[in-house]
Amino acid sequence: MTTTSPLNDERAVSRLRVDDDIVLASMPLRDGTDRAALSRFGDDVWDMAPAMFNMARKAFRTVDFGVIPCAAERLLAKEYIYAWMNERRADGEPRLRPVSGHTALATLRRFLDFVRSRIGKLDLANVDQDLIDAYATHHRARPITPGRVGVCLRPIVQLHRLAPYLTCGGITFTPWRGRPVYRATGQGTRCSENRTARIPEPVIGAMLRWALKYVEHLCDDIF
């Protein structure tokens, strides 16, 4: 059974990774990528760009762990992002995309800060259902969509799911008894109803007629 230990600098050495582990080990890479130049687990800034095939904002091309002053928390964050990107679990959950690493770190840190503010220290062993319910309530009270609330709660589920790959042991109980995150947001369904007003039929009809006319009579020059 995985045990959870308080996060302190004595726990800042990974039981599972070595500094030379390649961060993008399981990711498809762009043609011409020099594998010798890829970011390693021991680096405090991970370059995700070699595994990005579409344009992304500069901020999302790297994951910067150097902003975390506590060495043990920095290790937890590294193991969390590394495991989510590279480890395949039997539950079939998709792995973290490199372009999402920046956001995943931000949402993790937000939850860890909440834990510290509630119990006075960062100790995942003291995280219980009441605490994560309070965290969900905190985000539901914000002026954000239910989908965004779900994103904010995702670290809770992942800290449990990835516990075997975390030196500190992660969250040992099953959050919300295994219910999907979107139900914990109070949303009730996976997708909320689209409340955008329908385009009036006379308008959409005219648009379709012009589209068909263009395809049938006016677009020879593009074929």
Predicted regions and their residues:
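Extended, charge-enriched helical/coil interaction regions that scaffold DNA-processing
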Residues: 1-223
